[in-house]
Amino acid sequence: MLSAQLNFVVTLFGIMASAATLVAAEGNFVATTPVPAEYLVGFETIRESDSQELLRTLVEGEMQGRGTGQEGYLRAARWFATQLESYGFQPAGADGSWFQNVPFIKLATQPADCGFKVGVEEFIGGTAIGISDFAGAFEASLPVTFAVVTTNRPEIAEGTFAGRLLVIQSADRIRWDDAFIVRGKPACVLFVADDGRVRNEAVNESEKTPSSIPVAMVTTAAANALAARCGARADLFSANAPTENVLVSSSQMVQCRLKIERESVDVPNVVSWYPGTDETVRHEHVCVGAHLDHLGLQREELFPGADDNGSGSTAVLQLARAIHANPVKPRRSVLLMAFCAEERGLLGSKYYVAHPLKPVSDMICMLNIDMIGRNEESTSEPASENENTIHLVGSQDHSAAFHEMVRKANESVGFVFEYDEENRVDGRSDHASFSEKGVPVTFLFGGFNPHYHKTTDTMDGINFAKIANAARLDYLVLMMAAEQGRFALDEKK
């Protein structure tokens, strides 16, 4: 009887333990498999309340939107390193540093030194025009052509825009060296962009060659005001992606100017290391990362970047703490990084793979987390339909074995995976830098929403359950991958 009672108690305890692991992903997240016992302690340290506390520090403190090259980003990097040290991680940089400095050229302009006017009236001030990725100073008076183009560019004759200012909006991230622009030969280009990309300061790669023609950015509202003044439609440019090609030329002369100051600066990636327990394979490592930067302060406006990418940075910290708290440590090592300058074109992660602190050949996989704090939302898809969804990007296209491991880990978390954004975003976050080097990758992405690159990307409306569950998922993936080892890459299709 005693033996039977004891067996009953043991069985009951096991049922309760299994139930507890399933409850960890309760609510809209429905876990179907208990968390493996060897990973349970770390898993249970990941809590929504901590997600909220960490994110609040990144968003509402003195980090001022964490703009690359700005003091707020440096504060965030130092704080991030301090957190990692408290979780038992070691610095992975040169000479025991937590940082890998990335060299940049910082570009800056003052509102009084940029703008444009029609005739004698200066109707658009400097807050509406700003620095582009390939900015070059200019001052000129030119006739103007307005262009709205899709990814299927219109046919034009060579030199169509010769001697003209080209004001252009594209359905994709068009550059000055796009074949359409090169063929048109404009004298100067203004790219129409959302407000968050029109900056009075920016950083570029130190070796980046400026464009061969003067280029700048202009807000949608300012571009429409200019179009109206020059006889075109006042709603020619839209916040939505263009669906048809439109070209409108005017003989009206537009005076433009943009003066730029340049200086060399170093901006750090945060780099850390957690040694594996198995001496025979601890040189191999799982990489996990998120970009720490956002848009920062731009023309006296603060872009907080709660979702982009305070949420991913928060999840990475929670994952790090879980690794350290768990009694069973990873066999292989963990390289954990917070990247700078993702918003400037993945520059921090690109610099790392070009100047690795650990051999990239020893990296068995890379886990990237970016924008997992809000529910995807569009005019056709309400946020309420995406409480428990997340885009799983990269793994499906690169390694079936790795993809299956992620799916298996998710059975203990309960995300509903979506795959409809891969073509749109696969090359637009830091995992892409590693994928190009042949590393199996996975990218957790919550989807786009109306607050993307807006001053409204604050703590309001953040889904803390989604942040915590993203951390839980990648914690399990990391621990499982560190145990298993290398994954076969699929042949490119």
Question: For each of these PLM feature ranges, what is it?
Answer:
Residues N7-T21:
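Bacterial N-terminal signal peptides
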Residues A24-P91, H283-H285, E491:
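N-terminal hydrophobic or amphipathic helices/low-complexity stretches enriched
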Residues P34-V35, Y39, G125, G130-I156, ...:
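Soluble metallo-hydrolase cores and metallopeptidase-like ectodomains found primarily
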Residues A37-T45, G61-E71, F146, V167-D172, ...:
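Second-shell loop/turn segments in exported
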Residues I46, D50-E53, T57, E71-R75, ...:
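Extracytoplasmic/secreted proteins, especially bacterial periplasmic and envelope-associated proteins
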Residues G61-L165, W176:
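Noncatalytic luminal/extracellular "stalk/propeptide" segments of secretory-pathway proteins
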Residues I124, V215-A216, A223-A225, C230-G231, ...:
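Metal-dependent peptidase/peptidase-like ectodomains
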Residues R321, N449-K493:
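His/Asp/Glu-rich mid-to-C-terminal helical/loop segments that flank catalytic regions of hydrolases
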